[in-house]
Amino acid sequence: MTRKNTTTNPWAKFHGPNLGYVIEQYDLYVTGAGSVDPELQELFEIFGAPSFQDDVVTGDNTATHFSPQNTGNIEKILKVVQLVEQIRSFGHTLAHINPMEDAANGQSLLEKAMNELSDADLKAIPAKTVWQDAPEGIHTALDVIHRLKEVYTQTLAYEFSHIQDSEERAWLHQMVESNSLRQPLSNQKRTALLKRLTAVEGFEQFLHKTFVGQKRFSIEGVDMLVPVLDEIVLEGAKNGVEDVMIGMAHRGRLSVLAHVLEKPYSHMFAEFKHAKIEGAVANSGWTGDVKYHLGREQVVSNEEVSTRVTLANNPSHLEFVNPVVEGFARAAQENRKKSGLPEQDTSKSFVILVHGDAAFPGQGIVSETLNLSRLNAYQTGGTIHVIANNAVGFTTDSYDSRSTKYSSDLAKGFDIPIVHVNADDPEACLAAANLAIQYRMLFKKDFLIDLIGYRRYGHNEMDDPAVTQPQVYKKIKNHPTVRAIYADQLQAAGVLNADEIETITQFTQEQLKSDYAQVPPADTSDATIHVKVPDVVAKGIQSIDTGVELDSLRAINEGLLSWPEGFNVYPKVKKILERRKDALEENGKIEWALAESLAFASILQEGTPIRLTGQDSQRGTFAHRHIVLHDTDTNETYSPLHRLPNINASFSVHNSPLSEAAVVGYEYGYNVFAPETLVMWEAQYGDFSNTAQALFDQYVSAGRAKWGQKSGLVLLLPHGYEGQGPEHSSARPERFLQLAAENNWTVANLTSAAQYFHILRRQASILGTEAVRPLVLMTPKSLLRHPLTLSTASQLSEGRFQPALEQENLGMKPNKVKRLVLSTGKMAIDLAAEIESGKHEYNLDEIHIVRIEQLYPFPAEKVQSIIKRFKNLEEIIWVQEEPRNMGAWHYMAPILFELAGDKVKTGYIGRPDRSSPSGGDPFAHKAEQELIVSHALDVKYNFRQDKLEIEVFSN
């Protein structure tokens, strides 16, 4: 072929969509139907109509001497350009991506353009006119259309038109259209792929026949999930990835454990058989979990590379593992051993999330997690999503489970490329996997594979799916497995003969039988209803000296009040900070936020990294923290905690998106994978934390008992009744206390800045040890600057956290004390404020108050020792501001009954049972609160004298 001279042709540089634009503009120029760009107008005036005669390729079967100078040819070229773009954008509607259906019928989207162009029209147009990167052998527009339909409408289908970045979109189209994705596999790799499919199918069928009726949530129908994961993992390893994190639900999990994470078949069989086998790793938690929820960590390798693969433990709450695994990855990517922000390297780790086709659009946690993918505080350099699409959710058909054409459509809103692939075409599936990992490593963004198959059995193996999907399951019953399909293809291609295929099958069966033979008989001899909690957990957190030398605290405070020369701190913030200057001097007072900053700095100086996130955490919801400063002239930010001396640990504080569930899951995951780091999540108001309830229930409270998964996550939940209504009053401490058992976490509601300082330092000291556990803190709002919560420097430099505190200047005459009042948090401060105010006369000799700072584990020994001092004690009263059916009362009642014994009565003073946490009228709130306080302090106030009866005040 020869190319003619193009030096005099100004139109030669226009191709494809750009060409279409020029032609449209010329048409407007000729007809005067609209405005034309001045530069193009000048070209039209000088050179006339766009002419491509100089750019015509000559040779056999090519278009020659084609000129668009007449309107008819212009329109034809424009229609071809539009058709090319329609094939790219809508080819997926024609593709054969569902193995249970014939090729999709999306012809209507393309047929209009096709009908308006004859083959002769298409043959007359040079390929380069409509496809600049047309490969060798593509000469005419007809060749272009045939080639693009072949690429875009087979068993691989693509959705890229929503991608906003033109460079990414061009790269994706080039990868697809150049056919580099579908290069023939070597016979060796094809044989290996068949062996893998044979192992997957053989394993599932062996379980089905051997353990009849036991749940396993089979992978059959999307068997290619395992080779797809294999491909992504090993290609990632070739790119230097050190950690691959996988999150998935129960469907197909056993096969992924056995094959991708190389869990021995014998260990899997032992779990089904309830047998003990040497070398098997038992459930690390003391209560355990079902086999299809368990995770595993394994170094996976081939002859060339290796990488560590982690499959996260997972409850049956679909998709909630997603943010947890993202947190794993971020923790693995960051170097936290230097001061300042941690250094992130996204090439060290990446995430694979396996979704269900019903769960991906159905669970809101999916979109919450996707929203994290481009945010500074949460991005992990791209996640590869695989929808294991079996076209049914339990018994619900897809038309009842989503409002979109594809289960993957949600991803379009987050600019994620999507590939749909027929799970019965193994080589197409591997091509999709390769495109996914290449895109992720190059662009550091998410990619989605919609792996479309079917579910061979019911939701679980005891379920009959034909009851609800009779027609589909008639098809499935007669549909060959992907292993059988691929074996036939390899035999037809001469890669393997029938005997060789049978040998592969027999080898798999012999391996399964051999591994099963290693499993001893079932052994339930140690089964017991008495769960043994490890001693280190049962003992609780030991008392730890957490004081910091006064000179060190003063030096830290000086550093906290310093910023670079020329940095313009907002005047109001500057005034707030300058008030802290003398807080550690004699007669100085330390408020909550300063105590926190001092704790953070001292923890960092001891080598513990800190990560704090929340919706307003840099400033603080209540404008109290100001840990990140903003220059008023440049908006540049500065955190003094990044510049303090003697620190070799990172500090990061981030404002989070308006999400609770995904962010809590992320921070939990980060802490699990970075156990040496003090990870803290702060709710904007504690009331909103319940949108993350599934994370508290399934992970934070129970992760160690179920899976041996330790966490030291800190939850900061602003709590306190201040007349602000039902959504700005309660962190619902009753929920956390209901979940409290087996020393699984600490629940506290503090009354002083010093207590906050010490409990943070205590929490930091147990990180990375067997004693670690989460910390749930009901944090203050109005108490942040309350005079009665301020502390002195000596209270920080000396001592330790106190689970219970006695009210000063009360109980001085033990023999006169008749009433012991127990309360916590703001309620205790309200009582103290009333006493200090002196507005009312109370017989304070007859009353003593104990602040329960640590609600769980309850400081029983401390409280018991206080009770013993008062020989004439008549009653123990629990006082709270929450309604009786909320707050700590139902948790405290049995504890107090036991402490009181037979001779001392126990009672309750507080609001009555209510369905809403708080009223909306601030005046009614104030009246109620005053009544609670006065009743608590007035010994003459009689509650019912019946044994163990409870008094509830009513309006």
From Swiss-Prot:
<dbReference type="InterPro" id="IPR001017">
    <property type="entry name" value="DH_E1"/>
</dbReference>
<keyword id="KW-0786">Thiamine pyrophosphate</keyword>
<keyword id="KW-0324">Glycolysis</keyword>
<dbReference type="InterPro" id="IPR029061">
    <property type="entry name" value="THDP-binding"/>
</dbReference>
<keyword id="KW-0560">Oxidoreductase</keyword>
<dbReference type="InterPro" id="IPR042179">
    <property type="entry name" value="KGD_C_sf"/>
</dbReference>
<dbReference type="InterPro" id="IPR023784">
    <property type="entry name" value="2oxoglutarate_DH_E1_bac"/>
</dbReference>
<dbReference type="GO" id="GO:0030976">
    <property type="term" value="F:thiamine pyrophosphate binding"/>
</dbReference>
<dbReference type="GO" id="GO:0006099">
    <property type="term" value="P:tricarboxylic acid cycle"/>
</dbReference>
<dbReference type="GO" id="GO:0005829">
    <property type="term" value="C:cytosol"/>
</dbReference>
<dbReference type="Pfam" id="PF00676">
    <property type="entry name" value="E1_dh"/>
</dbReference>
<dbReference type="InterPro" id="IPR031717">
    <property type="entry name" value="ODO-1/KGD_C"/>
</dbReference>
<comment type="subunit">
    <text>Homodimer. Part of the 2-oxoglutarate dehydrogenase (OGDH) complex composed of E1 (2-oxoglutarate dehydrogenase), E2 (dihydrolipoamide succinyltransferase) and E3 (dihydrolipoamide dehydrogenase); the complex contains multiple copies of the three enzymatic components (E1, E2 and E3).</text>
</comment>
<dbReference type="InterPro" id="IPR005475">
    <property type="entry name" value="Transketolase-like_Pyr-bd"/>
</dbReference>
<dbReference type="GO" id="GO:0006096">
    <property type="term" value="P:glycolytic process"/>
</dbReference>
<comment type="similarity">
    <text>Belongs to the alpha-ketoglutarate dehydrogenase family.</text>
</comment>
<dbReference type="GO" id="GO:0045252">
    <property type="term" value="C:oxoglutarate dehydrogenase complex"/>
</dbReference>
<dbReference type="InterPro" id="IPR011603">
    <property type="entry name" value="2oxoglutarate_DH_E1"/>
</dbReference>
<dbReference type="Pfam" id="PF02779">
    <property type="entry name" value="Transket_pyr"/>
</dbReference>
<dbReference type="Pfam" id="PF16870">
    <property type="entry name" value="OxoGdeHyase_C"/>
</dbReference>
<comment type="function">
    <text>E1 component of the 2-oxoglutarate dehydrogenase (OGDH) complex which catalyzes the decarboxylation of 2-oxoglutarate, the first step in the conversion of 2-oxoglutarate to succinyl-CoA and CO(2).</text>
</comment>
<protein>
    <recommendedName>
        <fullName>2-oxoglutarate dehydrogenase E1 component</fullName>
        <ecNumber>1.2.4.2</ecNumber>
    </recommendedName>
</protein>
<dbReference type="GO" id="GO:0004591">
    <property type="term" value="F:oxoglutarate dehydrogenase (succinyl-transferring) activity"/>
</dbReference>
